[in-house]
C-alpha cells in the first residue's frame, strides 16, 4: 500500500476510539407533557439518559404501558462491544503497519459485517422491548398496539413522537469505514512503477544471449 493509503487506514482505525467517548445512538421522545423532551443515549458500554433523570423517566413511562425497564447491566452486548471495537482498531492498525492491500480489504469487510450485525441486533432489541409487554400489570392497554421505536427515523407512539438516529459516535464509525474504503480505492489507482533498464543491464542480457 502507498504511504498515503496507509496513513488513511491508520486515521480510520484511530477514529474508532471516538466511539468510546461519544454515544453511538440516540433515541428522543417528545410529547406535550414533556416540552423539553426525553432522550436516551446508547454508548459502547452503557445506556444513559440525555439528561440526568431521563432514563428513569423513560422507565416509569414504560411501566404504564407494560414495557420492561431498560437496565444497562442486563444487556450483554454492552459488555462485548468494547472488545469488538478494540479488535477492529488493532486489526486496522496491523493492516496499515504491514501494508498489504488484501488486509485492508479484509478489515473493511469485517467492519461492515460488524455494523450490519450490530444494527440487526439493535432492531431485535427494540422489537423485543416494544412487543414483549406485561399487559396484566400495564395501566394503559391498547389492543394490538406495540411500542417499538424506529431503527432510524421518527414514529408516533400514542402521544409520543419517537426519533431514533445515530449520535456522534455512530457518525465517527461511519467516517472510519469511509476512510478505510477511500484508502483501498486510492491504493488501487496507483500506477505500477515502471522499471528502467540501464545500459549495463542490456549488455549483460546480450552476453547471456
Located regions from the model:
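Hydrophobic membrane-targeting alpha-helices
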Residues: 20-23, 96, 119, 181-187
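Long, glycine/tryptophan/cysteine-rich extracytoplasmic
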Residues: 21-77, 123-164, 209
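A hydrophobic membrane-anchoring alpha-helix module
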Residues: 163-190
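Short, charged/polar micro-motifs that form catalytic or ligand-binding hotspots
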Residues: 1-7, 80, 99, 158-168
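Hydrophobic alpha-helical transmembrane segments
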Residues: 13-15, 19, 76-96, 108-116, ...
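Hydrophobic alpha-helical transmembrane segments of integral membrane proteins
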Residues: 84-132, 191-209
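Intrinsically disordered terminal tails
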Residues: 1-6, 22, 30-36, 185-209
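Alpha-helical transmembrane segments and their helix-start/interface "positive-inside/aromatic belt" motifs
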Residues: 1-17, 101-112
Amino acid at each position: 500500500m502507498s504511504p498515503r493509503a496507509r496513513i488513511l487506514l491508520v486515521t480510520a482505525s484511530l477514529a474508532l476510539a471516538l466511539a468510546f467517548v461519544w454515544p453511538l445512538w440516540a433515541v428522543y421522545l417528545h410529547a406535550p407533557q414533556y416540552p423539553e423532551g426525553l432522550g436516551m443515549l446508547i454508548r459502547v458500554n452503557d445506556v444513559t439518559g440525555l439528561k440526568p433523570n431521563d432514563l428513569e423517566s423513560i422507565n416509569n413511562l414504560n411501566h404504564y404501558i407494560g414495557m420492561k425497564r431498560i437496565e444497562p447491566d442486563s444487556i450483554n452486548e454492552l459488555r462485548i462491544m468494547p472488545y469488538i471495537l478494540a479488535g477492529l482498531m488493532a486489526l486496522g492498525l496491523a493492516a496499515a503497519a504491514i501494508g498489504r492491500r488484501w488486509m485492508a480489504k479484509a478489515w473493511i469487510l469485517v467492519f461492515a459485517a460488524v455494523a450490519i450485525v450490530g444494527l440487526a441486533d439493535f432492531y431485535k432489541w427494540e422489537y423485543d422491548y416494544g412487543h414483549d409487554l406485561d399487559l396484566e400489570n400495564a395501566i394503559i392497554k391498547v389492543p394490538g398496539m406495540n411500542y417499538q421505536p424506529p431503527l432510524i427515523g421518527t414514529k408516533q407512539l400514542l402521544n409520543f413522537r419517537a426519533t431514533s438516529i445515530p449520535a456522534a459516535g455512530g457518525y465517527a464509525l461511519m467516517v472510519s469505514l469511509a476512510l478505510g474504503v477511500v484508502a483501498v480505492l486510492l491504493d488501487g489507482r496507483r500506477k505500477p512503477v515502471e522499471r528502467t533498464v540501464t545500459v549495463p543491464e542490456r549488455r549483460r542480457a546480450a552476453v547471456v544471449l
